[in-house]
């Protein structure tokens, strides 16, 4: 009998949500995603020490300014970890722009170009990289410009339908709607403490976005993210991609049985509405308290981990 991970791969592209090279070797995903929190965790792994040392040495050669060296070393470390992961996967690595830039379109564009340049200088072409940006209005506008330059983007921290719609209309390559963090909010802010997978508000959100994209002929890839259990994952089988932590990949690989195909679209494509305006985006996003809370919370948490990473680098400089 097949295991559920093998069965899921027949329906959905499986992506590893980790910076851990050992996990890549074990689960052999198509793609991998990283973020500041995962880079910080990966930096604690002894085998990665040489990647940190190399990033610091390189940063020292780029600038005499200590502050700039810290920024450069963090960028180079994220790319160094990405390069190691790319040796083990056939597809793409997602590398994230500093979350503190999430409300500055031009700064996001500049940072994205810098990360791409570092990958290119290491011999990696753009078609193996996704630049991760927070799904703020400014992040989406940055992605719109980057896509025109041939830099594909992964729009993350996506919690509202307004964010999803704006991303599709901007022509971004991929979105990462969060599942588990949506459920976390409903558990914390409502009387309901348990959700069956089909009733999980995060699952319902991704299903709605997936159906809308397919019904309107958008090419933007839907990659469900931030899972709390395999029930959520199995309920989204058939989604374009799912990015899954090593712990849940392990659980899927140990569970026996075929996975039922849940998401698919065979209907007629409808005409698209006029693009959402900035005012409409903020009004509709603001109407969803969960999305407002989780977007700002996610940006703050990634920013905190970026600052921890910078402190770790500063202590080694």
Swiss-Prot record:
One of its GO terms (biological process) is carbohydrate metabolic process. Its main location: cytoplasm. The active site is at residue 132. NCBIfam families: PRK12346.1 (NF009001), talAB (TIGR00874). SUPFAM superfamilies: Aldolase. Keywords: Cytoplasm, Pentose shunt, Schiff base, Transferase. It comes from Proteus mirabilis (strain HI4320). The keyword Transferase applies. The gene is tal. Homodimer. Pathway: Carbohydrate degradation; pentose phosphate pathway; D-glyceraldehyde 3-phosphate and beta-D-fructose 6-phosphate from D-ribose 5-phosphate and D-xylulose 5-phosphate (non-oxidative stage): step 2/3. Its EC number is 2.2.1.2. Transaldolase is important for the balance of metabolites in the pentose-phosphate pathway. This is Transaldolase. It is found in: Cytoplasm. GO terms for molecular function: transaldolase activity. InterPro entries: Aldolase_TIM, TAL/FSA, Transaldolase_1, Transaldolase_AS. It comes from the Bacteria. CDD domains: Transaldolase_TalAB. It catalyses: D-sedoheptulose 7-phosphate + D-glyceraldehyde 3-phosphate = D-erythrose 4-phosphate + beta-D-fructose 6-phosphate.
